[in-house]
Design a protein with these regions (language model features):
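Extracytoplasmic "Venus flytrap"/periplasmic binding protein-like
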Residues: 70, 74-144, 179-181, 280, ...
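Glycine-centered hinge/linker elements that transmit conformational signals in sensory
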Residues: 197, 240-270
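Extracytoplasmic/periplasmic substrate-recognition and gating elements
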Residues: 46, 180, 256, 260-266, ...
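Hinge/lid segment of periplasmic solute-binding proteins
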Residues: 113-168, 221-224, 309-310
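Short, low-complexity disordered leader/linker segments with a strong preference
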Residues: 1-50, 73, 446-459
Length: 459
């Protein structure tokens, strides 16, 4: 599962930022007033056509298109959605960036979690809170999952509507654990996981765990150790992020615990792609793996042995630590006509509705962003036969509302990840000390943020 935006795309984003923002150091939430209401669409002549861009592929794209086809059928003669699948999130952002220059941004953009800072900074979106207030017959924001709302909020104001969520899980080959005499109850903490990984390797010869060198996992290790990933306030207050925070003692300890597993030979190197971890796990080449809940279907389709999924282990109390959600969210363009904005909001409301969320979640494995479907009998029946989905939902539902679990919000995220990954690879291989790796990553990431903010300010 690819999360990162490529360096080439990140550079393209920077080139187009100048002049997009009035200030690079403070946040300015989209206006919560003046949003168009139902009359804007009702008074429009003919069919209101809107554009919808996304970066999903495979079964996820198919499930999304099925919902959009349903929306078009229900709104025939009034609204028509023209969908454009961009192939990947990197391609989506590259095309979106080009559209900024000629003011042709799509009516609705569905983009991934780490692009949120950039999409917010370019100020081409309409406030979801304003649209909900002006269109009370559509989406009820209080139905959205709190963890999703927090991730897509700045200064306590919602800036995009979550479409789908993922959460980090620990997948476990129960047969290999039994051979090694390891109880799953010992895997609730990071220290317990490390001890189990070594014990499994010693007892069975199979590596205890696989973790892809995707920076999402270092963000999770940070949040579950009770620390911020960027400052101030993870970039979510009135001031935007100006530095990373990679060197807090409990954070370094969490990183070092995972690195210790690898240096002891109890971890399997699967590179940077989480899909490689799925392949290794299904082949019995690792007893455990960290992976996104979004791979649940792939794991189910490729494994032939009993396994379970467990919540991501913590290394700090829940009073200050928790996991960070991933996924994607929908952004409504402020460059669209009032009729298009209302039509776009109706599409967003439809896709985020309980019925649509149930269909999309069950087709893809993503955690639904709408909590109103939880009491549905059909949904309860589905979860009873899909325990991994239940574990993922429970983790998202129960995550503590603390600053660490909100995640870092910055338009420089892709560059930060590019700075962090090679340093962690060096630390995990033992070619560089953890302290030096984090110092080097900090220097590079802080420079990336500085460069981004300079471009954003138009200097």
């Amino acid at each position: 599962m690819k999360r990162s935006v490529t360096l080439g795309a990140a550079a393209l984003l920077l080139l187009s930022l100048a002049g997009c923002s009035a200030g690079a150091d403070t946040h300015s939430t989209p206006s919560a007033s003046g949003a168009p209401g139902p009359s804007a669409l009702a008074n429009a002549k003919g069919v209101t056509e809107i554009s919808f861009w996304h970066g999903l592929g495979g079964i996820n794209a198919q499930a999304l298109q099925s919902l959009i086809d349903e929306f078009n059928t229900e709104n025939a003669g009034k609204i028509k959605v023209d969908t454009s699948a961009q192939g990947s999130y990197a391609d989506l952002l590259a095309k979106y960036t080009a559209s900024l220059r000629d003011k042709s941004t799509p009516t609705v953009t569905l983009s991934n979690d780490i692009s949120s800072g950039f999409l917010y900074d370019v100020k081409r979106s309409v406030s979801p809170e304003a649209m909900a207030a002006a269109n009370p017959g559509d989406l009820k924001l209080d139905q959205l999952a709190p963890a999703g709302k927090r991730y897509y909020s700045v200064d306590d104001k919602l800036v995009a509507v979550p479409m789908n969520m993922s959460t980090p899980l620990l997948f476990v080959n129960t047969g290999l654990l039994e051979k090694a005499g390891v109880e799953t109850s010992s895997l609730k903490t990071l220290d317990g996981l490390a001890a189990a990984a070594t014990k499994i390797k010693d007892a069975t010869g199979v590596p205890g765990i696989a973790e892809a060198f995707d920076d999402w996992w270092f963000e999770q290790l940070t949040a579950t150790s009770g620390n911020l990933y960027c400052t101030p306030e993870n970039g979510r207050g009135t001031k935007s992020a100006d530095k990373v925070s990679f060197q807090k003692p409990s954070q370094v300890k969490a990183f070092s615990t995972m690195a210790g597993i690898y240096k002891a030979g109890a971890g399997l190197d699967v590179g940077t792609d989480n899909n490689n971890a799925v392949t290794a796990f299904a082949a019995g080449k690792t007893a455990m793996m960290f992976n996104s809940s979004a791979v649940a279907a792939s794991v189910a389709n490729s494994t032939t042995f009993p396994y379970v999924a467990l919540p991501f282990p913590l290394s700090a109390p829940t009073s200050k630590a928790g996991t960070v959600v991933g996924g994607s969210a929908m952004w409504l363009s402020n460059q669209a006509t009032p009729a298009q904005q209302v039509a776009g909001w109706k599409l967003i409301s439809f896709l985020a509705s309980p019925a649509s969320q149930a269909k999309f979640s069950e087709a893809t494995g993503y955690v639904p962003a709408n909590t109103a479907l939880e009491n549905s009998t059909a949904r309860k029946d589905y979860l009873a036969s899909h325990p991994v989905a239940q574990v993922a939902i429970d983790e998202v539902k129960n995550v503590s509302d603390v600053p660490a679990s909100h995640g870092c919000f910055t338009g420089a995220f892709s560059a930060i990840r590019a700075a962090m990954i090679p340093q962690m690879q060096a630390a995990f291989s033992g070619s560089k000390s953890m302290e030096q790796a984090l110092a080097d990553a900090t220097t590079a990431a802080n420079q990336a943020i500085s460069d981004y903010k300079t471009q954003l300010a138009g200097d």
